[in-house]
Regions:
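Charged, compositionally biased non-catalytic regions
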Residues: 1-20
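Flexible glycine-/small-residue-rich
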Residues: 7, 53-55, 64-66
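Residue-identity detector for threonine
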Residues: 10-12, 26, 31, 66, ...
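Short, well-ordered, mixed-charge alpha-helical segments that flank or form enzyme active sites
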Residues: 12-15, 42-44, 69-72
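Short Gly/Thr-rich strand-loop-strand
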Residues: 18-54, 59
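An acidic, glycine-/histidine-flanked metal-binding catalytic module
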Residues: 58-174
Length: 174
């Protein structure tokens, strides 16, 4: 059993949500709650925080992702639907499966986007820690503007890849 929470929040708020959920699940009878933070040591680009829950009735998992982490993961799943599940393991030596040069470029682009997302989210987190009523210096205002623009560019690129994958799936149905 499991659930996924996709939230339009900063990294700090993502962690706060996880901490609140840990407390809530413990109050509700979880005998064990383990946190697995996949934001820095991603697996094939995937980033999130997972809660592994143990209850007397069994196990459950809750994934908490930011909006960008979620968008990336959904696009990557679409790529895996088209190119094959093995794309998750291309970094491993004995990975079975091959990609065309074009497919390989797209998968590598997704991995690069994941790294950019990580950097942009860290920057967004830092910029958002400044209280709006504080007198912002020019550099901070500039950083906030650039961070917003980069986030928007990443969203646009993910949207374009999503549309490309939709068209590929459509053409395969014909």
């Amino acid at each position: 059993a499991g659930a996924r929470l996709d939230c339009d929040v900063t990294l700090t708020h993502q962690r706060c949500i996880v901490d609140e959920l840990c407390d809530l699940f413990t109050e509700c009878g979880a005998t064990r709650v383990d946190i697995k933070d996949l934001r820095d040591g991603s697996h094939s680009g995937y980033r999130a925080i997972h809660l592994h829950l143990r209850f007397p009735a069994g196990f459950a998992e809750v994934q908490v992702r930011t909006a960008l982490q979620s968008h990336w993961a959904n696009v990557y799943e679409s790529a895996a639907d088209i190119f094959g599940r093995h794309i998750r393991y291309l970094h491993e030596e004995n990975c079975q499966g091959s990609l065309s040069p074009e497919e390989e470029i797209i998968v590598k682009l997704l991995h690069v986007l994941s790294k950019y997302i990580s950097q942009v989210e860290k920057e967004r987190d830092e910029c958002s820690s400044v209280h709006p009523s504080d007198d912002l210096d020019y550099n901070m205002k500039h950083r906030q503007k650039i961070t917003f623009e980069l986030e928007s560019d990443i969203q646009t690129t993910l949207d374009e890849l999503e549309e490309l994958f939709r068209k590929v799936r459509e053409s395969r149905r014909k």
